[in-house]
Amino acid sequence: MSHTVKIYDTCIGCTQCVRACPTDVLEMVPWDGCKAGQIASSPRTEDCVGCKRCETACPTDFLSIRVYLGAETTRSMGLAY
């Protein structure tokens, strides 16, 4: 089943989500939008198993990373209406 991994610009570049991912879906890439100078990226979403460990690991008040599971993707992102 296909999942969507969305990373928001509230990412603080802490790498917690990258370290929490058991399937190495995430990696850090250079970004000037935060003090850390990097942001999470999801180049391998086809390997996402939907465990949402990345969401749990995210320390920001508004989760900077969200995993939308298969059919819930369009509904959760507000695209189904």
Swiss-Prot record:
It holds the Pfam family Fer4_7. Binds 2 [4Fe-4S] clusters. Cluster 2 is most probably the spectroscopically characterized electron acceptor FA and cluster 1 is most probably FB. It is found in: Cellular thylakoid membrane. PROSITE patterns: 4FE4S_FER_1, 4FE4S_FER_2. GO terms for cellular component: photosystem I; plasma membrane-derived thylakoid membrane. Its cofactor is [4Fe-4S] cluster. One of its GO terms (molecular function) is metal ion binding. Gene3D superfamilies: 3.30.70.20. It is an enzyme of class 1 (oxidoreductase). GO terms for biological process: photosynthetic electron transport in photosystem I. It is a peripheral membrane protein. Signal peptide: none annotated. [4Fe-4S] cluster 2 binds at C21, C48, C51, C54. [4Fe-4S] cluster 1 binds at C11, C14, C17, C58. Its EC number is 1.97.1.12. InterPro entries: 4Fe4S_Fe-S-bd (IPR017896), 4Fe4S_Fe_S_CS (IPR017900), PSI_iron-sulfur_center (IPR050157), PSI_PsaC (IPR017491). Residues 1-31, 37-68 form the 4Fe-4S ferredoxin-type domain. It catalyses: reduced [plastocyanin] + hnu + oxidized [2Fe-2S]-[ferredoxin] = oxidized [plastocyanin] + reduced [2Fe-2S]-[ferredoxin]. Its main location: membrane. Keywords: 4Fe-4S, Electron transport, Iron, Iron-sulfur, Membrane, Metal-binding, Oxidoreductase, Photosynthesis, Photosystem I, Repeat, Thylakoid, Transport. Apoprotein for the two 4Fe-4S centers FA and FB of photosystem I (PSI); essential for photochemical activity. FB is the terminal electron acceptor of PSI, donating electrons to ferredoxin. The C-terminus interacts with PsaA/B/D and helps assemble the protein into the PSI complex. Required for binding of PsaD and PsaE to PSI. PSI is a plastocyanin/cytochrome c6-ferredoxin oxidoreductase, converting photonic excitation into a charge separation, which transfers an electron from the donor P700 chlorophyll pair to the spectroscopically characterized acceptors A0, A1, FX, FA and FB in turn. The cyanobacterial PSI reaction center is composed of one copy each of PsaA,B,C,D,E,F,I,J,K,L,M and X, and forms trimeric complexes. This is Photosystem I iron-sulfur center. It comes from Acaryochloris marina (strain MBIC 11017).
